[in-house]
A protein has these predicted regions:
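Helix-to-loop junction immediately C-terminal to a conserved catalytic motif
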Residues: 52
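Conserved ABC transporter NBD signature motif
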Residues: 60-68
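Short coil-to-helix segment of the ABC ATPase nucleotide-binding domain corresponding to the Q-loop/switch region
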Residues: 98-106
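Conserved ABC ATPase signature
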Residues: 136-140, 144-146
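A short, proline-enriched helix->beta-strand linker immediately N-terminal to the Walker B motif
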Residues: 155-159
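Catalytic Walker B motif of ABC-type/P-loop ATPase nucleotide-binding domains
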Residues: 161-164
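N-terminal Sec/SRP start-transfer signal
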Residues: 232-270
């Protein structure tokens, strides 16, 4: 991964523009555990968002897997996130109506894979949840939910794991177990962790990049990695199975009926007049 001169400014109504990233450049290896450290407002989450294709830069270039993602269309960015990236967030982002196994299977179904139960069981065993496949995620502890989120991120075999404050909602001991797990996976993948916890960053990070006011103020870069091939990869377009989409839609109707009906009405109008 090569990051060259990226900048990002947020324009806010009735307020001064906020410079989130200011001319940032660095290279990252193909494997290892990299921490992006900083206080609130430092730009660390914005950096993760632009590297993962969740947000766009105003200028600069980000080359990943042989492609400059700053030049990709929205559809191509979606394919990049689906194929190249795994995400782990503080809020877990699990679907409560689905079982543990179904939540993990969803990542494979979005890639068009079918009959992949063996992959789900294998990844559950790796994260220490081999007996939880049929459980509802609402029955799990915070640490167990985060392990499910990690399993979902890893099961599709992405190049990079992006973790934004993955231990923020956990107690210290549970947080350590989650970082131990990510550290183990970083032996074969690039794991990028955003955190404000300097102690965890120094203990677990192969490299710690610290931000303040949108700029890099320190970069340990103590460990030198071997950068292997940069061949261009083919990324898969996400495909959500109709039965899963229906289940999620029914759940949304249960909690937000008016919003869902309004969305359906507007969609019908759009398809009718715009095609």
């Amino acid at each position: 991964m090569k990051i060259q001169g990226i900048s990002k400014t947020y324009n806010i109504k009735s307020a001064q523009p906020v410079i989130a990233l200011n001319d940032i450049s660095f290279d990252l290896p193909e494997v290892g555990m990299i921490f992006i450290l900083g206080k609130s407002g430092s730009g660390k989450s914005t950096l993760l968002n632009v590297l993962s294709g969740l947000d766009k830069v105003d200028k600069g270039h980000i080359e990943i897997c042989g492609k400059d993602i700053t030049k990709l269309s929205e559809s191509e960015l979606c394919n990049y996130r689906n194929s190249c990236c795994g995400f782990v967030f503080q809020e877990y982002n699990l679907i409560p109506e689905l079982s543990v196994g179904e939540n993990i299977m969803l990542a494979l179904q979005l890639q068009g894979e079918k009959n992949a139960e063996s992959k789900v069981r294998e990844i559950l065993e790796r994260v220490g949840l081999s007996e939880y496949e049929k459980r509802k995620v609402t029955e799990l502890s915070g640490g167990q939910k985060q392990r499910v989120a990690i399993a979902r991120a890893l099961v599709k075999n992405p190049n990079i794991i992006f973790a934004d404050e993955p231990t923020g909602a956990l107690d210290e001991q549970t947080g350590k177990s989650i970082l131990d797990l990510l550290k183990d996976f970083s032996k074969n993948k690039l794991v990028i962790v955003v955190t404000h916890d300097k102690e965890f960053a120094k203990k677990y990070g192969d490299r710690v990049i610290e931000l303040a006011d949108g700029k890099i103020v320190s970069d340990s870069d103590e460990t030198k990695f071997i950068q292997e091939g940069t061949d261009t990869e083919t990324w898969k377009k996400p495909k959500l199975p109709i039965q899963i989409a229906f289940k999620i839609g029914c759940s949304n109707f249960k909690y937000h009926p008016i919003r869902l009906l309004a969305t359906m009405f507007l969609s019908v109008i759009a398809f009718t007049f715009l095609g």
